[in-house]
Amino acid sequence: MKQKEHIERHIATHTVHSAEDRSAVSFLESVLNPGGRICTSFSSDDKWSNHDGFFEYVSNPDISKSPKQNFIVQIKGTHNFSEKNGVVSYCLKSLSFPAFIAKEVTADPGILFVVLNPDIREGQRIFWKAMSKSFLSDIDFEKESKIIKFSPEDEIKNTDESIELFCEKLNGIIDTHLFLNKLNSDDLEQEDALNIIEYQCNEISCFIEDLHDSPQYRDEVSRRIVRDLNDLCYATLILNAYKNGYTNVSEKLAWEVSQLRVDTRYLCNFLRGLKYINRRIPKEGQAERLMLKYYNYLWEIRRFMRENYNKSILENLEKFPLDLDTVDSEYYEKVAKQIENIDLTKRNVRVSRYYVHKITPFFVNGERYYEITLQLAGVYSTKYNRVTVYSKMTITTYYSIQIAYTETELELWGIRNNIKVLNDWKVAIDPTCLNKLSKMLMKHTKINRNYQEYVNLMEFLTETGMNLFELINMRKERFSQIYNRVFGTTNTHDFGDVLIQIRREYSKSSCKVGKNTIGYAMLHMRDEILEDLLPNKFYPKRISEKLFVSSRCYPFEKNPMIANLVGTKTSKKDKESIIELLDDSKVVSLVQPYMTIDNLISETGELLFKKSEIGSDAVIENYNTSLDDWERDKGYFIIEKEGLVTIASYYDTTINILKRLLQLTHNVSLDRQEENERFIKNCGIKFDDIDKKIALKHLFVNSNIMLIYGAAGTGKTTLINYISRMFGNARKLYLTKTHTALQNVIRSLDKNIDNCDFEIIDSITRSNSAVIHDIVFIDECSTIDNRTMELLLGKISNDALIVMSGDIYQIESIDFGNWFFYAKDIVKAKGASIELSSTWRTEKEELKGLWKAVREKSTIVTEMLSMEGPFSENLGENIFHLDEDEVVLCLNYDGKFGLNNMNQYFQNANTNSKAFSWEEWSYKIGDRIIFTNTRRSTLLYNNLKGTIINISYAKKSIIFEIEVKAFLTEC
């Protein structure tokens, strides 16, 4: 008899309630009445044959009385139970209710309530179980009864706190239920799944064959392939569950099973992505992008079928064009050969921790390999100390890891270079991060890497690829299993208690303030992120009395889709994590108009857009209506101006800043012009650029502001020096966004300029004092966001003179900042704005001309490259023959031709010294170096070049003697 038939035979046509059952119904109705959130419709007679009615659950009756979900229930009363070590055992003698839910006669989730001693006053106790997919799969429907074990977590006490906790768990059940409802609930036989895979793979292979003959149609063919991927993923999920010993497998069960192993989580992620696409057709050019991502999943499915079912599928997958150039192919073929020829036996991992920055799969002769860029974790982490490793295994975690690797030689361009091949890796979250997460919950822990609970937790995260956020949102049965596995045999469970508290109070289903911040922290567990979330002396306010979390996290709590978490750029750069946090496609769809405008502003630099590009009136109105008073006050709503739409805060701050700047251009001072001309005549400066001389002549004559635009090397700092000398007796304030930039300003100023103060912009904007200086210099203006600039201008008096410098093509601000871009075209008063265009970092006129053409987006750039050069040559061994002061520019920091890897090639080309090793890095005498910060000394400034002339080892350190060409004596 099949499982389906076993289930059906339990579904009853008639039931009889005992006196205990009727007492249980009555008592349960009296308890479940938490302020209108649960509306019961129970029956104590034989009204329904397989269940005892239902209740409507209202998530937040203060906002809406509309039920969020109905729950079907069975209510049993009993005196027959046993209790041992806090666990209550009860025998459910009829399986009609679980069978009724398993058969899915109802679309609503089911809950079994068991009331102990229902007719004994003050002795009643309520326990409950959700009829989840995994709970039902554990029931043997060939039998007539089931022993159910209730833990203390399953008890509902007659207190407000316990009822509130029950309601939060109902929210969690609803979230899981809504996603599972998108999945197919019908069982699929193993043979049927095999047939689906064979059919879909034959279709995909035909598409790839067509594409191989006509590669220009890659996007069009990719659309057809993407359309067929849902069934392929579905069938593979089913086969994976059968392989792991499950029977009667549905898509719902198969999806849950795929989450529990690191080597099958790709199926879970694949399905989530396909369900997000659903029946929509990707826009032009986007299917191609999806296929480049899904290519790796298809390779995984092919391997899965070959290893587990001895089936050959997608044999022509390698014919799908991945657009690798010749140098890429040559390099990756050599890497693959080295990986295949070395011993990959697992080794002990090294001490250093890394974050995975980027994973790039590549394919050679039908085999898949990975190029993995790792970022050193910790306070000394920079983009300059990333490490590239190669592997046949991927790394499946957001968290910091420790690695073991083998070095092997690879020759390219006549240079033998060591590459790192991964032997093993493990999750290794810095214990201080666990302690800081505990601190956020007002708990004090001192976990270190020697704690057995830490060791067990890291092993679990490594084996499963799961993250802590997923863990605390698992269904109760699964969470209990994992918790017992990790913490069941340890002497301590300090962090286990933290996880239980977070699961109880701040899971997805929670309505408490702080859940988004804590959820994001759990997803990433990085010290630099966690530190910003804590209150400090500048921002001591907390978001809640129950959390040690900064009040600056409040916008992110309100709406993480549109507000950045403090210190990050989550709303723009980490949409994936935010979508995982919310797990609600309706919320994502609701904020789509805002996100569309935000993206368009970032892409185009424009501020106003046609409404038709954003959405219908109804879509925009729905978004605006969803905002509360606080969000509207902060300007998150969308406004319309003459048929064009934009985001209110972006528009208002832009207009306010530009109005203030224009007000400062209405001052005329003829005396100032005379003073300027006198300075130019007597200063003794030999002007190398006539533009600077003209700027000084008209400085502050018609305006109280001076905007200086120009790329690096055009002399912005030189002009600021001239202005500082001109106002020698005035009180001067120099402001920058970062400490590094401020040190650069201090270093570049003439030492004989007096009356100078230097500050970080944030220290001014968060102080209660106004700026009292005569002239204010603001550097790197393109990195200052609108809100900060609006606050800063409010601190500066109308009488002060302001010099603002920057490059609009430079690094953008973390938050929205377009004011400096628009000011270039708005501020037109004579002498109020200058763009420096002459570069002083090359003497080659041809290169200067090309540089100017590129900056101006000239239509003849291609012609100049062809006729005026050569400006470039093919990458090869000539790159290692450097002139004395030559610098090689790399387009990025990562991968085979990124800055870090190219530095290693240059080092290996240095044959004048042996290598001195220190942790994962090697150094040679004669290596050229560059200082990237002023942490060691303000004299060793950012971008100062030097050469290593001696290296020696001390007991616990390495010592470098470095030759630099700089004045190291402070006046």
At which residue positions do the language-model features occur?
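N-terminal pre-P-loop "Q-motif" helix
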Residues: C683-N704
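Mixed-charge (Asp/Glu-Lys/Arg
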Residues: M1-S49, F55-L188
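Conserved helicase motor core of P-loop NTPases
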Residues: I694-L696, S703, I808-T938, T947-I949
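N-terminal accessory nucleic-acid engagement/regulatory domains that precede
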Residues: R303, Y309-D671
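ASCE P-loop NTPase helicase motor core
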Residues: K697-M864
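Switch/connector loops and helix/strand junctions flanking conserved nucleotide-binding motifs
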Residues: F81-N85, R121-K129, S137-D138, L742-V745, ...
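Conserved helicase C-terminal RecA-like lobe
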Residues: I930-C971
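Extended low-complexity, intrinsically disordered and solenoidal helical-scaffold regions
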Residues: D186-Y405
